């Protein structure tokens, strides 16, 4: 039996050569995965679409068909005019080539400012889509994203100006990751997501960053089993709550990863999760001031509202027996022994 081929093309290849390689492929040796990474230029997009359409027609059992769409300017150099221009290009392209997008399973977009209905229209066109990643994409400042899709399994959002993301009806959605939301209310509103199992939230907290209450955020998804929170070595933005409030939403939780807590922060507050999550099997805590990624200039920190390191107050109670069976990982570049001592003191071990 012939071995299925995995094909990856980048913008460094001339597209005439790309088309030639795809068209010359023996149909009896199927392509299973086709990943194409390219820049959003009108002529290139059309050439890519034609080449990929022929590959889809020839190799009808493509397990993965992915577009990773770049823009000519990186996010930090994009003005609003750039974002609007790139989104207009993309909308023209998808309108000209709906058949190709209907066959995609994975799509990663960057640096696009859409209209209100554009992203829902993209989801409607991409009928097979299983994974969507939006990096510095939105529908304008304070826009609200409404997401519905029958096949989507994974949603990943990096930054952008969404005021809220409503996950309305996603029957197959399993994984959600949201990095760097812009506003103070809960960044995600969960509707019908019956298979959601993994949630990852990453945020650089400043003085104005509101605390998230897990009892409210997860009220409609009490079946989540894997929760990952990354604090980027800055303010703790999760509010410790009484176990009686949290137990109904954390009862199915098996894995918790608390990443990049600021050094010097007392980790006793993390015990509220242990007290509420009766099915927890693994708790991983990383305490680290990541100087390569943190803002270190004192004046800039003051101007942007970064806060001084402050402990989160939490009065620990009596720890139930199931905590003793939870595997706990503690990681810190310089204070691992202190972390273990703190945790043992907290648990009374």
PLM feature segments, named:
Residues 2-12, 317-320, 326, 331-348:
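Acidic, proline/serine/threonine- and glycine-rich low-complexity intrinsically disordered segments
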Residues 49-56, 76-103, 120-128, 143-153, ...:
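A structural signal for leucine-rich repeat
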Residues 14, 41-48, 72-78, 90-92, ...:
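Short, solvent-exposed loop/turn at the beta-strand->alpha-helix junction
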Residues 19-31, 245, 319-329:
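LRR flanking "cap" motifs
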Residues 28-30, 266-267, 279, 340:
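Short loop/turn segments at connectors of secondary-structure elements within structured domains
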Residues 1-148, 158:
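Leucine-rich repeat
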Residues 258-292:
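Loop/turn-rich, solvent-exposed surfaces of beta-rich toroidal or solenoidal domains
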Residues 2, 32-39, 63-68, 81, ...:
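Conserved hydrophobic beta-strand positions in leucine-rich repeat
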């Amino acid at each position: 039996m012939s071995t299925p081929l995995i094909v990856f093309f980048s913008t460094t290849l001339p597209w005439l050569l790309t088309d030639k390689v795809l068209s010359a492929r023996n149909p009896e040796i199927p392509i299973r995965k086709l990943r194409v990474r390219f820049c959003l230029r009108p002529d290139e997009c059309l050439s890519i679409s034609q080449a990929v359409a022929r590959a889809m027609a020839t190799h009808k059992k493509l397990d993965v068909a992915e577009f990773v769409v770049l823009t000519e300017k990186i996010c930090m150099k994009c003005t609003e005019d750039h974002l609007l221009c790139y989104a207009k290009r993309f909308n023209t392209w998808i309108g000209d080539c709906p058949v190709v997008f209907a066959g995609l399973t994975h799509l990663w977009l960057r640096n696009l400012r859409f209209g209100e209905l554009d992203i829902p229209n993209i989801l409607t066109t991409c009928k097979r889509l299983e994974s969507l990643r939006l990096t510095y994409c939105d529908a304008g400042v304070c826009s609200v994203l409404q997401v519905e899709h029958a096949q989507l399994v994974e949603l990943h959002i990096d930054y952008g100006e969404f005021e809220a993301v409503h996950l309305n009806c996603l029957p197959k959605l399993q994984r959600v990751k949201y990095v760097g939301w812009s506003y103070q209310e809960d960044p995600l509103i969960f509707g019908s997501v019956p298979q959601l199992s993994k949630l990852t939230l990453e945020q650089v907290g400043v003085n104005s960053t509101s605390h998230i209450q897990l009892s409210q955020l997860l009220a409609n998804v009490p079946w989540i089993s894997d929760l990952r929170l990354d604090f980027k070595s800055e303010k703790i933005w999760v509010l410790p709550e009484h176990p009686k409030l949290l137990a109904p939403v954390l009862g199915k939780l098996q894995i918790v990863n608390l990443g990049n807590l600021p050094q010097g922060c007392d980790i006793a507050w993390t015990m509220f999760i242990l007290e509420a999550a009766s099915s927890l099997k693994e708790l991983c805590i990383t305490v680290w001031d990541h100087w390569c990624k943190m803002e270190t200039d004192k004046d800039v920190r003051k101007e942007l509202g970064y806060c001084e390191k402050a402990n989160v107050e939490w009065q620990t109670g009596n720890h139930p027996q199931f905590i003793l069976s939870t595997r706990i990982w503690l990681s810190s570049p310089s204070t691992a022994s202190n972390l273990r001592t703190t945790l043992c003191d907290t648990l009374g071990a």
